[in-house]
């Protein structure tokens, strides 16, 4: 099968390129095609007229010409300021990389679908180092069902509230219409190397009128990615001795994904509509052998290739959108999201944390309810203005039958039972916000905003922001912003019944055993986000540079000092706030209209600093710089070619281990700069059928996982740290996509 996919992809590429090159002297692409190509890095505003420097858009056409395999994060990562990384610098679950915006980590990236938050990853427990065994929340919508993706960075994201300190990814789906439309799409790839998992995906959509004022949309999806071979990293692992001598760091796990979603729209009055939507998704992993500490036991070996965790997600929402002749618009919605995280039993103590201790499944049930209402009012008082007022209420409730079960093996914690602790936790957030877009002159837009959040556990937070867009001469625009962003602690971090135990290895400053306990006295994380950008636009040319700095306060981590010691000498640590951290960098953009049919788009991100001011250690392990370049050629109306190039800079590991000691030996390993080249071709065979074939990583620049970042072990054996070498990068991969629609 893989050879057939390679052959088909190669034939599509050769055939289209063969047609293309003889036509190079006669470029006949339409203006519409040109504008579509130029949308690659169009900077938009977050639901308003403000043109912020930290907003980028990925269009449906770009997704069609560069279809992602596992997850749309593969294409989101090509936006300025975006990378993929783990929840922490530990390297644990190193191949479960998620979207990191401006070095603030995945926990500070808010994922939205059609403007509504997605929270299923919150049903996965936090490990001692802050990791979650999760695939993130960017795979709930099939790529072919996406109209566009907005990536919002910096101060512009603060209006979205909790969890948006790094930025926001808003996945916007294709809508209903007055005419019947349908599609069937399929995607398959074939890695050059047999030890890498392949992907197959198929999905459909159907939309149209139901009669009267009603219309509907329905889509469904099936996809499967095989797990990497259990020994994919053999020969590349860091040194392992004793009982760990025969263990290997795992590759990327596979996944089986099923989605179905239905929406009915009722236009019950002029400029007024109600939408009723329901969706069901099921994601099951195909286990590749990973454990939190890259160790093994008989259950690890037995479960390779099987499902060991299943995430079920049910969503129900009602949305009322309205407008009036005077320009006033309203948006009101209610959403109920019900993720159920079902997984095999895992250890919660020391070296056995995250490794299977049972083949029995236990459930973690998360219930998330959100109510949202906002109104936008245009008016003319001194200057043209557009005032937005809104409110939100969010409740999260969790029943965790899996993670609150660690016995107090190291002795008592006053007030808490060794067994039978409550599996329940919950929190509510009530929010009010106001934003005013003020057109001071034809070239000056000022946007002040204020958001208030009250969290039932951590209390009040105020998030003011101010953004300015100032035209300079005909072609230059100065863009500036400052905002106070906010993130509430998770239900695990605030739950005193969530307790982890270590006999000493996991303890920061203790030689003997220690506990880590949830802390209901935490403060919310905040960040003062600032950016200044200068942009030039003329005749299709776009050039810009943006400086950003996030002064991060009260980041939540496992504690550095014990708060109590019991009569057995066991220290008690809690989740605590780190006083200060800072992230700073530069983003650059250059788009060149080479000709009427050739467009060259580029962006670069350069990180100046990312550190915990208390310890000086790094906040996340991301490249020093990332360059993304795309060359698109619309050969003729029905044929387009594309090359993509990404260059990742050096990646440096943590400076200190989990005990606060400077890293040594292989713990200091860096990832050297490397680059990835991709080629693709798209042919619109008919009005209703298109083919895309391509190859990722043309020069087969592979990267292997060597282990976790830090050394662990004891008298019976040692697993030496791998520094920054904690993930796999796939080699050369051929792919073919068929899209049909009517």
Language-model-detected regions and their locations in the chain:
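A beta-strand signature from Gram-negative outer-membrane beta-barrel systems
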Residues: 133-185
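Extracytoplasmic beta-strand/coil segments of soluble accessory domains associated
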Residues: 73-121
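C-terminal beta-signal and adjacent terminal beta-strands/loops
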Residues: 119-122, 553, 647-656, 682-742
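Short, acidic, small-residue-rich periplasmic hinge/interaction motif at the N-terminus
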Residues: 25-65, 106, 114
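Periplasmic-side early beta-strands and strand-to-turn transitions of outer-membrane beta-barrels
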Residues: 178-303, 554, 650
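Outer membrane beta-barrel strand-and-loop segments of large Gram-negative receptors
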Residues: 368-377, 421-425, 431, 519-523, ...
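Gram-negative outer-membrane beta-barrel transporters
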Residues: 185, 439-445, 547-552, 568-658, ...
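Surface-exposed extracellular loop regions of Gram-negative outer-membrane beta-barrel proteins
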Residues: 284, 456-458, 475-530, 547-573, ...
């Amino acid at each position: 099968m893989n050879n057939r996919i390679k052959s088909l992809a190669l034939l599509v590429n050769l055939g289209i390129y063969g047609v293309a090159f003889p036509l190079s002297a006669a470029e006949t692409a339409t203006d519409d095609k040109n504008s579509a190509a130029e949308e690659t890095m169009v900077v938009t505003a977050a639901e308003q007229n403000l043109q912020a420097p930290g907003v980028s858009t990925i269009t449906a056409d770009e997704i069609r010409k560069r279809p992602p395999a596992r997850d749309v994060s593969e294409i989101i990562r090509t936006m300025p300021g975006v990378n993929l990384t783990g929840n922490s610098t530990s390297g644990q679950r190193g191949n479960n990389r998620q979207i990191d915006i401006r070095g603030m980590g995945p926990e500070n990236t808010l994922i939205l679908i059609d403007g509504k938050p997605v929270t299923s990853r919150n049903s996965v427990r936090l490990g001692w180092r802050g990791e979650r065994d999760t695939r993130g929340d960017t795979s709930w919508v099939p790529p072919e069902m996406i109209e566009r993706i907005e990536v919002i960075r910096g101060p512009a994201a603060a209006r979205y509230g909790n969890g948006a300190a790094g930025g926001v990814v808003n996945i916007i789906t294709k809508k209903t219409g007055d005419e019947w439309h349908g599609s069937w799409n399929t995607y398959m790839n074939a890695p050059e190397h047999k030890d890498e998992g392949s992907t197959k995906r198929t999905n459909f959509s159907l939309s149209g009128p139901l009669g009267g004022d009603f219309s509907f949309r329905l889509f469904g999806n099936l996809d499967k990615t095989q797990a990497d071979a259990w020994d994919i990293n053999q020969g590349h692992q860091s040194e392992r001795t004793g009982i760990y001598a025969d263990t290997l760091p795992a590759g990327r796990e596979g996944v089986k994904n099923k989605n179905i979603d239905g929406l009915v729209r009722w236009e019950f009055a002029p400029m007024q509509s109600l939408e009723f939507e329901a969706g069901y998704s099921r994601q099951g992993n195909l286990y590749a052998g990973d454990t939190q500490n890259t160790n093994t036991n008989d259950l690890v070996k037995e479960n390779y290739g099987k499902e060991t965790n299943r995430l079920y997600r049910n969503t129900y929402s009602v949305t009322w959108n309205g407008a009036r002749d005077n320009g006033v618009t309203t948006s009101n919605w209610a959403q109920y999201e019900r993720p159920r995280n079902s997984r095999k039993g895992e250890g919660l103590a020391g070296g056995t944390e995250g490794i299977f201790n049972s083949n029995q499944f236990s459930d973690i049930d998360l219930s998330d309810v959100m109510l949202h209402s906002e109104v936008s009012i245009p008016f003319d008082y001194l200057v043209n203005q557009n005032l937005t007022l809104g409110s939100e209420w969010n409740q999260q409730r969790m029943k965790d039958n899996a993670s609150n079960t660690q016995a107090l093996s190291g002795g008592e914690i006053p007030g808490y039972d060794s067994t039978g602790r409550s599996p329940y936790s919950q929190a509510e957030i009530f929010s009010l916000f106001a934003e005013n877009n003020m057109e001071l002159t034809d070239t000056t837009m000022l946007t002040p905003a204020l958001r208030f959040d009250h969290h039932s556990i951590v209390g009040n937070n105020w998030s003011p922001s101010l953004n300015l867009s100032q035209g300079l001469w005909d072609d230059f625009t100065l863009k500036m912003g400052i905002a106070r962003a906010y993130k509430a602690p998770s239900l695990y971090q605030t739950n005193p019944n969530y307790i982890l135990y270590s006999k000493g290895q996991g303890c920061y400053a203790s030689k003997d055993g220690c506990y880590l306990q949830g802390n209901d006295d935490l403060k919310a994380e905040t960040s003062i986000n600032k950016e200044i950008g200068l942009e030039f636009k003329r005749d299709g040319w776009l050039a810009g540079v943006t400086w950003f700095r996030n002064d991060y306060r009260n980041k939540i981590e496992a504690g550095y000092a014990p708060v109590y010691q019991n009569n057995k000498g066991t220290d008690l640590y809690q989740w605590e706030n780190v006083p200060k951290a800072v992230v700073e960098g530069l983003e650059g953009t250059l788009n060149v209209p080479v000709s009427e049919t050739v467009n060259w788009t580029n962006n670069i991100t350069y990180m100046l600093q990312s550190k915990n001011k208390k310890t000086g250690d790094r906040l996340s392990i991301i490249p020093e710089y990332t360059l993304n370049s795309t060359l698109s050629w619309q050969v003729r109306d029905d044929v387009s070619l594309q090359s993509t190039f990404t260059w990742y800079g050096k990646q440096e590991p943590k400076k200190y281990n989990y005990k606060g000691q400077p890293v040594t030996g292989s713990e200091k390993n860096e990832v050297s700069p490397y680059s990835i080249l991709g080629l693709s071709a798209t042919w619109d065979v008919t009005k209703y059928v298109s083919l895309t074939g391509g190859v990722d990583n043309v020069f087969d620049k592979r990267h292997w996982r060597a282990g976790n970042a830090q050394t662990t072990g004891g008298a019976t054996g040692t697993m030496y740290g791998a520094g920054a070498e904690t993930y796999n990068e796939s080699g050369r991969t051929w792919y073919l996509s068929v899209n049909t629609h009517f």
